[in-house]
């Protein structure tokens, strides 16, 4: 089936609910889809919809155990999760005074009830349409997650898919609601939602790398020069996304003359393993005597200018064949749809769906579309862009919470303009905090408006700053094996890649100092820095909440005991990311997004661990037929013996035949090492690097099992994080006389009570200690006091 519907709906029969799960009246139909999910339809004409919609593509859920009791006027339905009471044939809406008069759904075992038009005020919210020009307080849209334990999705206005596989308006004005009654089982709610609307896309592997977007006018030579500069700086780049200035002035769908040969450009980018993307606005006018006009005018009414809006099936087909396919055949890999119309989300959804399907069917490759959030099952095909955000700290401060709130609607791929898009003041500290957030987010796009003074190019900062940027953009590329595995888990199990702490720790929702923290995949915790540093100590004072268990800082390896609050200090080059005890982080040491030849595997002590690395060709759907490589990493931990087993479990033809490994046992002392395949030894070398034990295995067959055993007396070294160490580091970096530093050290870390320490610090003014330093050390004493 070559239609858009045929791509998303494999079997139309699955769009119809089972007969014995439906209760049908003259004007209503109630479908019990799962024990937590009920569909409510009301149509005075008594006609109900079994076709798929833009949002809903599956209703053939297994039969649910429920009881239905009814009289001539009343209906009651009971499942293990909810009890529904309905006055038959009445509209679902009650009066303003008694809104649940006609319909009420109660969560069993609670006093919480849902009714039509319920405000759902305790909903945690999800991402909005965009953050274009954001200012002020963040207001989120309604998501699925609520402390009430219920949420409703209104599908009444969605287009339906007809028998020809094309979308059309509904014939009647109806109510078509899906009510999720899940108590505290958000994970099960998301499973119901994904089955109803489709599971998330499997993102192409290249999309997880570093993107470049600057809305400038480029020539071929400009692009060649920029790409080569990234290579010279040893900064990986995976996508080059053109802004709104790639097309002709009077033809918004044809390359301008500055890009002389798009296919030649495409060939160059392919040679550098970089994908080409375009920004496109499907609402742009089409003017007479242009290439696009001449192609579509015979099929539309003649006019001096044409437009694909308002959309209909004829226009969408013309758009597909004369715009999308033309550009795909011209070398375009990705589309950024800049149809910025918050009031017309259904049209935005249509364009996204047509772009996605056209690319998949034309190139026989996985597709991905960038778009603002129309919130119509966008998890199936889209990367949500937050829009043209302002370059400032205020915007950065709301991004972590905004990004992870997407998970409350089953969405993972949210892309911010890293650095901010426009306006504001270019500032390195702000820029690096944006980059660090991007590294530990599902997407990273260096982006800005056109303008000479927007500095997104890493080499335009001074040398020390450039090295920090380079460090993090390379770290992003290193993390791709981990990210791609987490993306696969999201695609198959529906577990969002980033998740707020309040899923496990509801109290965090009401603690503004910690609300921005989130889990990044299954192994990491991120505590984003979104405020300016203290210029005197040259560090940010960051408050942290560490969850249950033992956690280790990703970079330093410092140990943090869980279920505790901390205060730490971070320089520009530092970022608070933590790994659980027993975590195994598999990373790439190559400078591209391919399945790596050279891997680094970081293992954190404290408990047993395992991780299943997933790899495939990164671009096609062949993985659906089993074309994938699965490698198990198993870590057996004891006080005096560490064992790591690397065991290939599935098809290995998609990975390099020979691989090299850098195994990094974090916080580990010197040990006796053996490396084997279980039968014979494998050549390897061992060394100590800072607090870590490094084992290098130069080359081994990817199909080989590897067993690494470390034995010694108390292998884990003591790296418990101490605030005194942080403060000593601050003191060491300050430009203060060394003799004064010694006096300050004795005061800060001596046995005097805090009150007397304050007095002694103030006395140092007589010794020449400047007031700004006195104030800083008094504040540090307060920090010590609170820890």
Predicted regions and their residues:
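C-terminal low-complexity, glycine/proline- and small-hydrophobic-enriched intrinsically disordered tails
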Residues: 582-787
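A conserved hydrophobic secondary-structure block that centers on an alpha-helix together
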Residues: 133-134, 213-259
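Short, well-ordered beta-strand segments enriched in hydrophobic/aromatic residues
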Residues: 30, 38-42, 77-84, 525-528, ...
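A low-complexity, Ser/Thr/Gly/Pro-enriched, surface-exposed linker/loop concept
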Residues: 8, 33-72
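Catalytic core of carbohydrate-active enzymes
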Residues: 367, 377-384, 399-402, 406-416, ...
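Aromatic- and carboxylate-enriched substrate-binding clefts and catalytic-loop regions
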Residues: 106, 110, 117, 236-469, ...
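Solvent-exposed beta-strand/loop surfaces of large extracellular or lumenal domains
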Residues: 51-65, 553-572, 673-697
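Catalytic and substrate-binding clefts that recognize carbohydrates or anionic sugar/phosphate headgroups
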Residues: 68-207, 214-216, 227-232, 504, ...
């Amino acid at each position: 089936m070559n239609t858009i519907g045929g791509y998303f709906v494999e079997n139309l029969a699955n769009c119809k609910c089972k007969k014995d799960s439906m209760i049908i009246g003259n004007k209503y139909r109630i479908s019990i889809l799962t024990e937590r999910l009920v569909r409510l339809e009301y149509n005075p004409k008594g006609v109900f919809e079994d076709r798929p919609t833009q949002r809903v593509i599956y209703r053939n859920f297994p039969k649910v155990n429920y009881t239905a009791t009814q009289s001539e006027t009343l209906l009651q339905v009971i499942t293990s999760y909810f009890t529904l009471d309905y006055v038959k044939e009445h509209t679902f809406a009650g009066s303003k005074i008694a809104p649940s008069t006609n319909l009420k759904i109660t969560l069993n075992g609670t006093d919480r009830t849902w009714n039509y038009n319920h405000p759902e005020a305790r909903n945690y919210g999800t991402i909005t349409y965009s953050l274009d020009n954001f200012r002020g307080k963040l207001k989120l849209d309604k998501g699925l997650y609520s402390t009430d334990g219920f949420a409703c999705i209104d599908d009444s206005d969605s287009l339906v898919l007809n028998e020809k596989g094309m979308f059309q308006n509904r014939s009647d004005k109806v109510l078509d609601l899906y009510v999720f009654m899940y108590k505290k089982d958000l994970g099960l709610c998301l499973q119901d939602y994904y089955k109803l609307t489709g599971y998330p896309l499997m993102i192409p592997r290249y999309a997880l790398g570093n993107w470049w977007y600057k809305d400038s006018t480029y020539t071929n030579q400009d692009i060649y020069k920029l790409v080569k500069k990234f290579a010279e700086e040893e900064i990986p780049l995976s996508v080059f996304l053109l802004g709104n200035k790639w097309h002709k002035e009077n033809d918004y769908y044809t390359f301008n003359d500055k890009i002389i040969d798009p296919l030649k450009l495409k060939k160059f980018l392919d040679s550098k393993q970089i994908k080409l993307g375009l920004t496109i606005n499907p609402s742009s006018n089409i003017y007479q005597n242009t290439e696009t006009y001449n192609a579509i005018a015979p099929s539309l009414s003649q006019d001096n200018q044409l437009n694909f809006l308002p959309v209909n099936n004829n226009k969408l087909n013309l758009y597909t064949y004369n715009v999308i396919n033309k550009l795909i055949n011209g070398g375009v890999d990705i589309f950024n749809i800049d149809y910025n119309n918050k009031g017309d989300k259904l049209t935005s959804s249509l364009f996204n769906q047509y772009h996605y399907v056209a690319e998949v069917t034309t190139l026989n490759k996985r597709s991905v579309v960038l778009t603002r959030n129309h919130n119509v099952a966008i998890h199936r095909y889209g990367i949500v862009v937050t829009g043209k955000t302002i370059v400032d700290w205020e915007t950065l401060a709301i991004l972590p919470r905004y990004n992870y709130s997407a998970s409350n609607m089953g969405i993972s791929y949210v892309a911010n303009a890293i650095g901010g898009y426009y306006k504001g003041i270019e500032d390195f500290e702000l820029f690096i905090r944006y980059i660090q957030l991007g590294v530990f987010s599902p997407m990273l796009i260096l982006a800005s408006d056109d303008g000479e003074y927007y500095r997104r190019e890493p080499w335009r900062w001074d040398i020390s700053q450039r090295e920090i940027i380079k460090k993090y953009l390379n770290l992003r590329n290193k993390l791709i094996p981990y990210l791609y595995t987490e993306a696969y888990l999201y695609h198959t199990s529906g577990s969002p890649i980033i998740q707020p702490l309040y899923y496990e720790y509801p109290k965090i929702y009401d603690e503004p100092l910690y609300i921005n923290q989130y889990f990044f995949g299954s192994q990491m915790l991120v505590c984003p820095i979104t405020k300016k540093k203290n210029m005197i100590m040259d560090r940010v004072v960051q408050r942290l909440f560490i969850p249950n268990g033992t956690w280790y800082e990703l970079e330093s390896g410092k140990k943090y005991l869980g279920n505790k609050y901390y205060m730490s200090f971070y320089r520009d080059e530092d970022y608070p990311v933590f790994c659980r005890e027993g975590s195994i982080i598999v990373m790439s040491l190559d400078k591209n997004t391919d399945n790596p030849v050279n891997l680094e595997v970081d293992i954190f002590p404290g408990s047993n661990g395992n991780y299943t690395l997933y790899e495939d060709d990164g671009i096609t759907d062949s993985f659906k037929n089993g074309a994938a490589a699965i490698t198990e990493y198993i870590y057996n931990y004891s006080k005096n013996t560490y064992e790591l087993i690397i065991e290939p479990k599935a098809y290995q033809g998609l990975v390099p035949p020979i691989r090299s490994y850098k195994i990094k046992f974090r916080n580990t002392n010197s040990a006796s090492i053996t490396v084997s395949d279980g039968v014979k030894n494998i050549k390897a070398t061992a060394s100590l690097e800072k607090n870590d034990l490094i084992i290098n295995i130069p080359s081994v067959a990817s199909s080989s099992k590897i067993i690494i055993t470390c034995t010694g007396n108390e292998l884990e070294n003591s790296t418990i994080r101490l605030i005194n160490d942080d403060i000593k580091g601050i003191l060491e970096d300050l430009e203060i006389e060394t003799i004064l530093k010694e006096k300050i050290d004795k005061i800060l870390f001596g046995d005097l009570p805090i009150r007397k320490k304050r007095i002694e610090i103030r006395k140092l003014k007589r010794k020449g200690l400047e007031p700004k330093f006195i104030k800083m050390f008094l504040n540090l004493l307060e920090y010590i006091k609170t820890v």
